[in-house]
Amino acid sequence: MFTRFFIVIALLVIISVPSSAQWPDHKDPRAPRTADGKVDLNGPTPRTSDGKPDLSGVYRNVARGNDEPRQALSLDEKPLATFRDIGAGFKDGLPLQPWAKELLQKRMANNSKDNPDVWCLPLGNQQFNVHTFPRKVIQSPGVVLLLYETHQGIRQIFTDGRSIPKDDPQPWFYGYSVGRWEGDTLVVETKGFRDGGWLDINGSPLTEQGRTIERFTRPNFGTIEIEQTVDDPKAYTRPWTVTLRQQIIADTEIIDEFCLENERFARRVRWEPSGRPASRVRTRARRAAIAPSTRPPPHYRSSAATKLTAPSRLAWPSAGTAR
């Protein structure tokens, strides 16, 4: 009887594995395609019933762009931001206030261990915009939702005509965002940030006085470009603007990703000469040493296996004080 029960359970597991592994693969009937059936990334921009560009889709950073710094090539072009350094495209770096420059240097010298990404806290929309994990845009009347695979982040951009609340006593990790259409461009203003924010992995700061303007355009089916201006007089001597480029990932969906905080993980973070954190470079080796009973399912895109005994840490890490 036991043997028969075991065989039935084993068969159910075998049958269910292909199903769970394939569920994100679903052809988008709206996607333009070439003669060989591949998605035509240069196809026409999709539009909503009212004629506005439809930003909906699953996106990731372009293969060459947000991961590699590059200065602007013309007066009309803005420097490309990177995941590690949002100001990497500026010849002289970001226009930091003296105290903010000192804070950034301190964060980098500490291997960015207090980055919200390490402690599984919300990253803020700037880090999310350049993150290597995909994000999904859902455009509907009155609101645009951005669902981030990493940290399961959710951001709302209200397009119903409302204004940003004045003197809002409740700061937000993502700020409070309202958008309006200017032709084919969605212009998004965000204010109301928490103090102590991080714009990138290095730790370029964002304070409670920060204000951002993002200009979303979709020049073709496969691309979204975001021109982002940061205006934070407390941390920077002047406003500055960067460009972020996203490419659509057609015929798929975002999946579950869990971040389980662990003090030991933060203490292990060291940077390799390649510029990648050694803790992530060696993730595969560490996972192999974990007992099978504690190993997460293979479709989890996180280092959760190294963080199963995490203590609780709810407070925002110390970010320094303005001088």
Region roles according to the model:
Residues 2-6, 11, 17-305:
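PEST-like low-complexity, intrinsically disordered acidic/proline/serine-rich tracts
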Residues 308:
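Cationic, low-complexity basic patches in intrinsically disordered or flexible, solvent-exposed regions
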